[in-house]
């Protein structure tokens, strides 16, 4: 079965045609429209049109609280124009093919559970480091949606109790690529070292730049603390780290090392019998959302 698959993010829409062997063809990306749902549908339809007759349906993952069964976006995430509105139905009417939608983090978790780093796990999670932090929980061998479709929304968790309203205390602002680059800006003189991208930051890390290595470790310590908290709460076997920067081996290595450090000297208020989870890289990396969206469509039929 060939499907048109969309991974809708806050900055870009990744797309491809995918078949049951998970081969991705005609892949590309375009900027995500930010003005209206109508413009959003226009872009999706224009991307689908060249594949009409080839792709028999549309599988899509997107940010927000997604009611997959009814094709509704209850919370729009970065795309506020989708909040509280139907997405699958109107898009299906315009394209004339079935449309299935799901949350992006849950799609990543499904991809890794069915055919990736979490295969065979009963209780596990993906931790997707991007503009924010995406999550998807596997509980008792199934993807956990939650009572209101909000399970795994790690970005909204707080790191301190100082000010709930301060976005700078959220996991999404601190433990994301956004947070990593913000940390770099705070510790590096911008007059001599201008704003850099994630790729440029890791070029410095891999070249052995001392300050960049310190910044990375500080960032990974925060991520490791959140993974430790999730493990204490849910008794997770594995946590698969994904997102664009997960392709950097030193990121995964440093998160593991920081988690080892936490468990080796946790302080007095900690039971040494508490298990430490295994940290792995998502098999599908930044493609996990696309693969999971395909699986979601097939399993929903």
Residues covered by each model-derived region:
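Short beta-strand segments
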Residues: 7, 59-63, 126-132
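Active-site glycine-centered loops adjacent to acidic/histidine catalytic or metal-binding residues
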Residues: 104, 130, 293
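Conserved phosphate-binding catalytic cores of ATP/NTP-utilizing and phosphoryl-transfer enzymes
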Residues: 88, 99-124
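A charged helix-plus-loop insertion that forms the helical arch/lid used to bind
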Residues: 71-84
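ATP-binding/phosphotransfer module of carbohydrate and carboxylate kinases, centering on a glycine-rich
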Residues: 1-57, 66-70, 91-97, 114-120, ...
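Hydrophobic "anchor" residues
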Residues: 23-24, 73, 143-144
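A short acidic/small-residue loop/turn micro-motif
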Residues: 31-33, 81, 150-153
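Glycine-rich phosphate-binding loop of actin/hexokinase-like ATP-binding domains
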Residues: 119-174
């Amino acid at each position: 079965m060939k499907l048109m698959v969309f991974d809708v993010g806050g900055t870009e829409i990744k797309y491809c045609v995918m078949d049951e062997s998970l081969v991705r063809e005609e892949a590309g990306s375009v900027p995500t429209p930010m003005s209206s749902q109508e413009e959003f549908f226009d872009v999706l339809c224009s991307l689908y049109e060249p594949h009409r007759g080839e792709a028999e349906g549309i599988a899509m993952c997107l940010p927000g609280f997604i009611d997959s069964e009814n094709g509704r976006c209850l919370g729009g995430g970065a795309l506020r124009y989708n909040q509280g509105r139907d997405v699958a139905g109107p898009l299906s009417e315009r394209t004339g093919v079935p449309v299935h939608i799901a949350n992006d983090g849950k799609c990543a978790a499904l991809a890794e559970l069915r055919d990736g780093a979490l295969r065979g796990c009963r209780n596990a999670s993906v931790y997707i480091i991007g503009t924010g932090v995406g999550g998807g929980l596997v509980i008792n061998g199934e993807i956990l949606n939650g009572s209101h479709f909000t399970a795994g929304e790690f970005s909204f968790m707080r790191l301190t109790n100082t000010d709930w309203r301060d976005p700078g205390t959220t996991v999404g602002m601190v433990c994301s690529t956004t947070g990593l680059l913000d940390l770099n800006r705070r510790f590096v003189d911008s007059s001599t070292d201008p704003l850099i991208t994630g790729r440029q930051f890791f070029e410095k890390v891999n070249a052995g730049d001392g300050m960049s290595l310190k910044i990375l470790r500080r960032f990974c310590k925060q991520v490791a603390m959140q993974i430790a908290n999730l493990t204490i709460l849910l008794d997770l076997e594995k946590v698969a780290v994904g997102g664009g920067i997960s392709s950097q081996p030193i990121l995964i290595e440093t998160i593991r090392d920081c988690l080892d450090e936490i468990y080796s000297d946790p302080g007095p208020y900690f039971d040494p019998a508490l298990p430490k989870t295994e940290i792995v890289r998502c098999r599908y990396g930044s493609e996990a959302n696309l693969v999971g969206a395909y699986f979601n469509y097939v399993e929903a039929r």
